[in-house]
Amino acid sequence: MVSFSSLFVAACAAVTAFALPSELEKRAITTSQQGTSNGYFYSFWTNGGGSVSYNNGASGEYSVSWSNCGSFTSGKGWATGSSRNINFSGSFKPSGNAYLAVYGWTTSPLVEYYIMENYGDYNPGRSMTFKGTVTSDGSVYDIYTHQQVNQPSISGTATFEQYWSIRRTKRSSGTVTTANHFKAWASHGMYLGSHNYQIVSTEGYQSSGSSDITVS
């Protein structure tokens, strides 16, 4: 005879087995939001195109997977940026147009900036204004500027400058000495304002892929 206790344990196991997927789904973020997770600021934005699923992991870890996306930006870091040294490690596996970068904003002036460590099949520098180079953390980076006209920003729809450093030797782990880039930008008249958030971002545009990154 099967005991009641055996049936109870089996029933609990079955409930747990069915509960786990829903618990996982609760941790998946698919709509634009910002917040704090395990001591780190996180930001996820999507224009709603395709399928994009973002997950906050332990400490500074996050993962994101996307399929035929429209446009999205995601990542973990700090609510207030600075000239800190940023460590990152993990995997970045895009199919199409995607970026892995230190990403942030400043105000007064309003600036969106990228220190790009890796990218998919498109180097965005092709459509920007080349300003020079900086050598940092084992590679040469090409410096670019680009003006965004009437585009979304942390201050609403606005016209603002983008500053870019694009690494010539791609990587998915290492240390980014942000001060080297900020100083190089300033030497070309590319000045930052008061820092808003600063993250290690995975960004995709009309592409598919996955990324799992830990920030510290």
From Swiss-Prot:
<dbReference type="InterPro" id="IPR013319">
    <property type="entry name" value="GH11/12"/>
</dbReference>
<keyword id="KW-0843">Virulence</keyword>
<feature type="domain" description="GH11">
    <location>
        <begin position="28"/>
        <end position="216"/>
    </location>
</feature>
<keyword id="KW-0378">Hydrolase</keyword>
<dbReference type="GO" id="GO:0031176">
    <property type="term" value="F:endo-1,4-beta-xylanase activity"/>
</dbReference>
<comment type="function">
    <text>Endo-1,4-beta-xylanase involved in the hydrolysis of xylan, a major structural heterogeneous polysaccharide found in plant biomass representing the second most abundant polysaccharide in the biosphere, after cellulose. Acts as a pathogen-associated molecular pattern (PAMP) that can trigger plant cell death. Triggers a series of immune responses in citrus fruit and enhanced the resistance of citrus and other fruit against fungal pathogens.</text>
</comment>
<feature type="active site" description="Proton donor">
    <location>
        <position position="203"/>
    </location>
</feature>
<dbReference type="InterPro" id="IPR018208">
    <property type="entry name" value="GH11_AS_1"/>
</dbReference>
<protein>
    <recommendedName>
        <fullName>Ethylene-inducing xylanase</fullName>
        <ecNumber>3.2.1.8</ecNumber>
    </recommendedName>
</protein>
<comment type="pathway">
    <text>Glycan degradation; xylan degradation.</text>
</comment>
<keyword id="KW-0732">Signal</keyword>
<dbReference type="GO" id="GO:0045493">
    <property type="term" value="P:xylan catabolic process"/>
</dbReference>
<dbReference type="GO" id="GO:0005576">
    <property type="term" value="C:extracellular region"/>
</dbReference>
<keyword id="KW-0858">Xylan degradation</keyword>
<keyword id="KW-0326">Glycosidase</keyword>
<dbReference type="InterPro" id="IPR033119">
    <property type="entry name" value="GH11_AS_2"/>
</dbReference>
<dbReference type="InterPro" id="IPR033123">
    <property type="entry name" value="GH11_dom"/>
</dbReference>
<keyword id="KW-0119">Carbohydrate metabolism</keyword>
<comment type="similarity">
    <text>Belongs to the glycosyl hydrolase 11 (cellulase G) family.</text>
</comment>
<feature type="active site" description="Nucleophile">
    <location>
        <position position="112"/>
    </location>
</feature>
<keyword id="KW-0964">Secreted</keyword>
<dbReference type="InterPro" id="IPR013320">
    <property type="entry name" value="ConA-like_dom_sf"/>
</dbReference>
<keyword id="KW-0624">Polysaccharide degradation</keyword>
<dbReference type="Pfam" id="PF00457">
    <property type="entry name" value="Glyco_hydro_11"/>
</dbReference>
<feature type="signal peptide">
    <location>
        <begin position="1"/>
        <end position="19"/>
    </location>
</feature>
<dbReference type="InterPro" id="IPR001137">
    <property type="entry name" value="Glyco_hydro_11"/>
</dbReference>
